[in-house]
Amino acid sequence: AFAPEITAKDVEKILGMPKFLREEYEVGGMTGVVTGLAWTEVGGDILYIESVLTPGKGKVSLTGNLGDVMKESATIAHEWTMAHYKELGIDPKLFETNDINIHVPEGAIPKDGPSAGITMVTSIVSSYTGRKVKERIAMTGETTLRGRVMPVGGVKEKILAAKRAGITELILSEENRKDIAEIKPEYIAGLTFHYVKTNEEVLQLALE
């Protein structure tokens, strides 16, 4: 018999053990690896964006079963980085003497949408500058060629995913502030929110 209030243990008894365990946050202090947040049909999830430079001639490769919109986000992120190399402290020769691969793990799962834009910017800039990503921080937001951070949907589900993964700081578009105000305080306890308008603000918060 089961108690009237269903617990996690009851769910396992009824449905069996989970098919897989969601990977917990594990990328703090690394170069080129950034934690993003995604919305899925079954709720929010964390999403890692990885990028790495290899000797080459400036080729940009995108891997991880990405949809067209997500590929466009990666292209925009890289173009913005190239256009702002001086402010970012990047040697422009790196663009000519290296290829960059931008990868989103779990390649068997299709991924699309614009909300990983600022995550891709952060990953790319981290790889070109060698600056590490701060620990326990995640982000979600669309970016433009002008470097503006646009709002995204599914914020509540993404926030819950961040809490499950042990994230403590979140970067969102200033225009998503109203969405956080609608979430019950107990759901966001222990989280610090940073609301931004530009890519530069994202990088200042996310990179060491």
Where in this protein do the model-derived segments appear?
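Peripheral, non-AAA+ core regions of ATP-driven protein-machinery
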Residues: 2-11, 17-35, 42-208
